[in-house]
Structures are given as structure tokens and as C-alpha cells.
Design a protein with these regions (language model features):
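Kelch-like beta-propeller repeat domains
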Residues: 1-345
Length: 345
């Protein structure tokens, strides 16, 4: 990484050594360090510095979860009845620590329902969903910076959609499929450039796909299963794959289990084939969610409807054997997990 600093990063140290020290600084100290001086702040918040840390192996993976918040279901009249409120929980598997992020802008009580998460250049991106009071679709984009510990609003999605596939690659977030305000399944897609705060339309898929799931594998974005407007709930067994290099789609047959909802439970096995996290162990067969954290996977789910949500870690090398390690979870973070993603900070 080339630096153009006029003054030394750390007094009395060569610039290269000062950069090495900053690179090794744990992400949990970035917020305090960014307040030392403008030079440190600019460095810690720069995209080049993030990729420099990533190249040298000093980034850190955490799980970000859309999770039901205990005791908040009727807070300030935000909801009627017993419908849960959702917030964003962060779990660090290395330190076994939990925290809940501050609310996103415009929604002081809870997240938009069914919003989607993606990780992009060390930041957490929240898109779409339903207004938690009116249940109308929203097109909001929110970006969380783990250095400043603050949210900002991004440019809104060009069109409102729900239950779409989402994935990120090379500083961009891809949004494809889902359904519009009239519940028509979509085959359109858009890509959001985080640095430019701009949207660009993608070439369309071959068919419409509602409630599809997005997975980035290498240089490809897989949009798994889904169903058409006239086939509600009839989940397809194929997938469409977007090649980042060519910008073209291709269809892959027999990629998924026909009739099974793919939402948040699509994984990639050791052989590179798609798999369902729900098949790993009976303990997570209902509502299974999987988040890959490097060599580990965080699994959430329950053995049957109505039982408490359980949380596990599993080593990827043992994924086919289903050797689950139970996570001890504080009560305030034991709520139902709707979806999630890994953020490499």
C-alpha cells in the first residue's frame, strides 16, 4: 500500500513501520484510534487501507444477524399483538461476544421487516424490506461503518422489491429477483456501487424468481431457486448464475431441492456443490440459517416448530459429518434469527 502522508503516522517511527503498527490494530480499537488525529481517521476509513489489511490477513470476520429482540414487541406502540421486533446482532466467534447495533436511521424502534443484509468492503449494508408499521415495501439503503460505529443512508433502491437475492463482490452489492408491490415475481436486477453511491441496472435473468437466495461463489453470483408469479410457493430446483466478468446469465439445472425454500439456508459444500444447512443435523432442521465465517459456519435453527432457537458453530472440514458445537448465548441474544451475513471488518 502506497502512503502519501506528509507527517509521520507515529512520531519517531519510519512511515513503513507506522503503517505496519496501524495495520495490526484490532478493529475494536479503530473507533478510538480514528479520534487521535485526522491523518489516522482518514487512513482507518480509507478503502485502500481496508484492502491492505485484508491482503495481509488482519481483517476479522463477524456474523451480523437480523434477530428478534426480546421484550420489544409492543415497544412504544410500534406493533400490535405479539409480532416480534427485529434488530441487528453482531456475534464474534473468536471472542464469543455479542452486541446489538444502534437502530438504523428513520427506524428508532426496529428494522424494516424482511430487510436484506450484505457485507461490502468491511461495512454492513441493509436494503429493502417492509415498513414495520404500515407493512408497505420500502427502498431504503443503510450502511454501517464499524470504524465510526455509525449508520449513514445510501441512495435508495431504484425500485421497491421484497424477498430478493442479494450478494456482494468487489465493492458492489447485487440485488436480483424477489417481488414488487403487487406481488409480481421479478427477473430484473440492480448493482449498487458502495463507493460511488450509485445504482446500475443488470441484464435480466431468464425467468422471474420470487423468494430466491443469493450466494457468491468465486467470480459468480448464484441466484438459487425461487418461483414465478403464477406458481406461488412452488420452489424451482434450478439456479441462474451471473458471471461478473461477462455480465451474462446461465442456467444450472438440478442445483437445489425442488419444493424447498432456499431462504438463508443455502450453503456450499466441500465439493463446491450447493447444500442445505438444514440437512446437517436434526437439531437445526427447522428454520436453519447458516453464516460462513472463514473456516467456521455459524448455524441457527430449532429441532421442531415451537422449540427455542439454538446456536452452533461447526468447522467447515467437519460440515459433512455434522459435528456441532453449541454456543452459550445470553438471554437477550437468544431470539429467532431471520437472516444474516458475514462481515469481514
Amino acid at each position: 500500500m502506497e502512503t502519501t502522508m506528509v507527517t509521520e503516522l507515529i512520531p519517531s517511527l519510519p512511515q513503513e513501520l507506522g503503517l505496519e503498527c496501524m495495520t495490526r490494530l484490532p478493529y475494536t480499537a479503530h473507533r478510538v484510534a480514528s479520534q487521535v488525529c485526522k491523518q489516522w481517521c482518514d487512513l482507518l476509513e480509507s478503502k485502500d487501507f481496508y484492502y491492505h489489511r485484508k491482503k495481509l490477513g488482519y481483517t476479522h470476520k463477524v456474523a451480523c444477524l437480523v434477530q428478534a429482540v426480546h421484550g420489544a414487541d409492543v415497544l412504544q406502540g410500534s406493533k400490535q399483538g405479539n409480532s416480534p421486533c427485529f434488530g441487528i446482532t453482531v456475534f464474534d466467534s473468536a471472542s464469543q461476544t455479542w452486541e446489538r447495533l444502534d437502530p438504523v436511521p428513520n427506524y428508532p424502534i426496529e428494522l424494516p421487516l424482511f430487510c436484506q443484509l450484505a457485507s461490502c468492503e468491511g461495512k454492513l449494508v441493509v436494503m429493502g424490506g417492509w415498513d414495520p408499521v404500515s407493512y408497505e415495501q420500502v427502498s431504503h439503503v443503510f450502511v454501517y461503518d464499524f470504524t465510526t460505529r455509525k449508520w449513514r443512508e445510501g441512495k435508495e433502491m431504484p425500485s421497491k422489491r421484497s424477498f430478493f437475492a442479494i450478494g456482494s463482490y468487489s465493492g458492489r452489492v447485487y440485488v436480483v429477483g424477489g417481488h414488487d408491490e403487487n406481488k409480481n415475481a421479478l427477473r430484473t436486477g440492480w448493482v449498487y456501487d458502495l463507493s460511488k453511491d450509485e445504482w446500475t441496472e443488470l441484464t435480466q435473468m431468464n425467468q422471474e424468481r420470487d423468494e430466491c437466495e443469493g450466494v457468491v461463489i468465486g467470480d459468480e453470483f448464484w441466484v438459487v431457486s425461487g418461483y414465478g408469479t403464477d406458481n406461488q410457493g412452488a420452489f424451482e430446483g434450478d439456479a441462474e448464475v451471473y458471471e461478473f466478468g461477462s455480465g451474462q446469465w446461465r442456467q444450472v439445472k438440478k442445483a437445489w431441492i425442488p419444493g424447498r425454500c432456499p431462504r438463508s439456508c443455502v450453503g456450499v459444500g466441500k465439493d463446491g456443490r450447493l447444500m442445505s444447512w438444514a440437512d446437517l443435523d436434526p437439531m437445526v432442521r427447522a428454520g436453519a440459517r447458516g453464516i460462513t465465517l472463514g473456516s467456521q459456519v455459524m448455524l441457527t435453527g430449532l429441532d421442531n416448530q415451537g422449540s427455542p432457537e439454538e446456536f452452533y458453530l461447526i468447522e467447515m472440514k467437519d460440515a459433512q459429518n455434522g459435528k456441532l458445537e453449541k454456543i452459550i448465548v445470553p438471554d437477550e441474544f437468544s431470539g429467532f434469527v431471520q437472516s444474516g451475513c458475514c462481515v469481514e471488518i
